[in-house]
């Protein structure tokens, strides 16, 4: 492939990576990871509510990795509330999983910025077969994509398996019990998904620029070495 086309491809990949890093940094600070609807089970059972009557007992909340807000309803009007995970909810949430989500998100940001630098260096510098060359690009893209995947898996497990929304809704609620009715991933979660997809796309762009996948190259080299041994 001509040098000019390689520069364009690497520049595109660098811009994509930089946009991903900015997106994930923004996503970390927003309460837009998930939106949940919760039912005041105690109140609904007391009055035997059904159908449209349940709307009076439906609350909702949205939250991210650090803070969130919502409205509780138990038949007596809306009660807005705000919360933060640190330090308010430390005793109510699976702390190890939550901290790992934040940690892998930060690693994702750092590696994505490193990937941006690598792509720009390969576009305008003179890279060789070293860590900052094609091997480095594949390595950073793979690790970054893996971190993005881990963030999504861990967050989904915290929400679904550990019932994070229910724990938040029932936090410091001695009288009423709340049950999750519906949960939807929102903007920030999908930003991480897009970032994961972009790192996969960057791997394809590296291949499009004419650089073999590392494992493919190793197989070809091994085949050549075996052929040479047979000849001699």
Swiss-Prot record:
UniProt keywords, alphabetically: Cell membrane, Glycoprotein, Hearing, Membrane, Sensory transduction, Transmembrane, Transmembrane helix, Vision
BP terms from Gene Ontology: actin filament organization; auditory receptor cell development; auditory receptor cell stereocilium organization; cell motility; equilibrioception; neuromuscular process controlling balance; photoreceptor cell maintenance; positive regulation of lamellipodium assembly
Transmembrane regions: 8-28, 101-121, 135-155, 186-206
One GO CC term, this protein: trans-Golgi network transport vesicle
Sites where a glycan is attached: 48, 184
Lipid bilayer topology: Multi-pass membrane protein
Places the protein is found: Cell membrane
Main location: membrane
InterPro entries membership: Clarin
Job description of the protein: May have a role in the excitatory ribbon synapse junctions between hair cells and cochlear ganglion cells and presumably also in analogous synapses within the retina.
Record-stated family: Belongs to the clarin family.
PANTHER family to which the protein is assigned, alphabetical: CLARIN (PTHR31548), CLARIN-1 (PTHR31548:SF4)
Protein name: Clarin-1
